[in-house]
Amino acid sequence: MTGGQPRTREQRKVDTLAKLAAPAADVWVATAAVDAGGHAGSYLVPLSLAWIDQRAVLATEAGSVTAGNITSHGGVRLGLGPTRDVVMIDAELEHVYSLDEAPAGLARGYAAQAGWDPRKSGESMRFLVLRPLRIQAWREADELPGRTLMRGGAWIP
């Protein structure tokens, strides 16, 4: 990914949306929390992603640390792609669906993009619908300026 000129904001947005909509897109999901004893903990796990209606959709066990952190605190950071072609997303929890509550289109869309169907993995799975607040994308140091593509939940023109 080295060489050439830095991509324009428009090209970065096109590339970012293509990555988000790609089949079997996986993201690193970073969350943090403070436990009852006052000890801070950070957690990083890989999860499958679906990009549905401009939202990041994850599926995980309801009792997982990641689901607990997201549902308790609302904030999450997602990392997609290798370090020399990365997309970083800061997002907030918009909705949690149990398997039987999930809209059919969301569940089907997730299964189609992620390549697996959480509805076949047990009743404790949850869909987490995340609204992106900030999206950044860059490849090399020459793309650090202008890396922010979305701010406050709105694409920057």
Predicted segments, located by residue:
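Charged, gly/pro-rich active-site loop segments
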Residues: 1-11, 85-157
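Short beta-strand segments
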Residues: 24-62, 68-70, 76-80, 88-92
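Short, basic/aromatic recognition patches
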Residues: 2-28
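Hydrophobic small-molecule pocket/channel-lining residues, especially in calycin-type beta-barrels
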Residues: 14, 21, 27, 79-81, ...
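Short secondary-structure boundary/capping segments
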Residues: 18-19, 48, 68, 118-120
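A generic alpha-helix structural signal
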Residues: 17-21, 67, 103-111
